[in-house]
Amino acid sequence: MTTTFRADEGLAFLLQYENVAWYDAGEVRILDRRVYPAKTEFVTCRTHVEVAQAIRDMVTQSAGPYTAAAMGMALAAYECREKTEAEQLAFLAAADGTISNARPTTAKRMKLVCDGCLEAAKLALREGRPVDLAIREHAVNANNRRYSKVNEIAKYLVPLIPAGGTVMTQCFGETIVGMMLKEAKLAGKDFRLFCPETRPYFQGARLTATVCRDMGFDVTVITDNMPA
């Protein structure tokens, strides 16, 4: 069954699924958050090993590596599409290990993501469906669940913020930032945001502030020693 619901609707460019990491036709494109928003560039990966390297190289961060991992598993399925069923499963199991361990600090959760993709692959093989597309659909469904859960949190968060008030963020909260602003817009509530820069990668200055701006909110970047 093809996924039609998209929980990223109405969010900033940076939070759209295709602009995090996306598999299509034998490639995974990952938005390079190391240079965004000064440059909008995508790193194109043509093997799952290249996806693992991109994750290791901090091309994407926050929740981005988990989406990249799932899309990397879809790419692995494409790589081994001409093999026998047993060979495909062995190849995907090896890819699971490669991608899961791309970044030591995320290995445990990454393994859960990749294991889920492996189960989606097994089901697709039993049903005779294209494995790469089945894994991508699984990844989109996982994103939908996560985004929707965070959206429910945002619905409780927004009423706590006074109209015309001030919110200070920290680092890049990714989905909760976008969903908070989306729910605020739906409620007709406006407020100002201050984003500490977040050294050394400047996630606050580059990512959080850009999401706030893209969604139409007044945002000011401050240095990390200014919040007090």
Where are these regions (language model features)?
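Glycine-rich phosphate/diphosphate-binding loop of Rossmann-like nucleotide-binding domains
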Residues: 170-221
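Glycine-rich oxoanion-binding loops at beta->alpha junctions
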Residues: 34-38, 43, 208-209, 213-228
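Long amphipathic alpha-helical segments
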Residues: 11-127, 132
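Fold-independent oxyanion-binding glycine-rich loops
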Residues: 32-34, 47, 69, 170-173, ...
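Short coil/turn connectors at secondary-structure junctions
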Residues: 17, 24-26, 61, 163-165, ...
